[in-house]
Amino acid sequence: MRTYSPKAGEVTHAWHVIDAEDVVLGRLATQAALLLRGKHKPTYAPHVDTGDFVVVVNAEKVALTGNKRDQAFHYRHSGYPGGLRKQSFGQVLDKHPERLLEKAIKGMLPKNKLGRAMGKKLKVYAGPEHPHQAQNPQPFEINAKVEK
């Protein structure tokens, strides 16, 4: 029996929707990255994009454990001398909650062309609504919710 190697045209990409409400940021990011890479499929191959589309809703309600809201920072650089900008996770979450999730998830993908293609299949929305109902996304449950 020969080893099966998936081809780019043979792969079907399903759609998953994840509700981020009260889910710990890192636990959500690892599950989303796993779906984007396609490691949940028996036909996974590291050199082919076998992953699925992931829609994350309620990004503004994601949970941060401990004091990360105030003590963990998000850095970005303009490219100019002295252009380093630093914001706490809380500031980023208040202003652009989808950016925090996108950075966490994309940081868990490969740093090459294939990883960038996988990152394009990630759709993050701050609220409960998303424009992808026509794709019939299947709910994906994450069991790492924070008890309040």
UniProtKB/Swiss-Prot annotation:
- GO molecular-function annotation terms? mRNA binding; structural constituent of ribosome
GO CC terms:
cytosolic large ribosomal subunit
Tell me the GO BP annotations in alphabetical order.
Answer: negative regulation of translation; translation
- What keyword terms does UniProt attach to this protein? Ribonucleoprotein, Ribosomal protein
Q: Which InterPro entries does its entry note?
A: Ribosomal_uL13, Ribosomal_uL13_bac-type, Ribosomal_uL13_CS, Ribosomal_uL13_sf
Q: Which Pfam families match?
A: Ribosomal_L13
Q: Which PROSITE patterns match?
A: RIBOSOMAL_L13
Q: Where is this region: Disordered?
A: 128-148
Q: How does it assemble?
A: Part of the 50S ribosomal subunit.
Outline what the protein does.
Answer: This protein is one of the early assembly proteins of the 50S ribosomal subunit, although it is not seen to bind rRNA by itself. It is important during the early stages of 50S assembly.
For this chain, the family text in UniProt reads: Belongs to the universal ribosomal protein uL13 family.
Query: What is the recorded name of this protein?
Result: Large ribosomal subunit protein uL13
Q: Which organism is it from?
A: Saccharopolyspora erythraea (strain ATCC 11635 / DSM 40517 / JCM 4748 / NBRC 13426 / NCIMB 8594 / NRRL 2338)
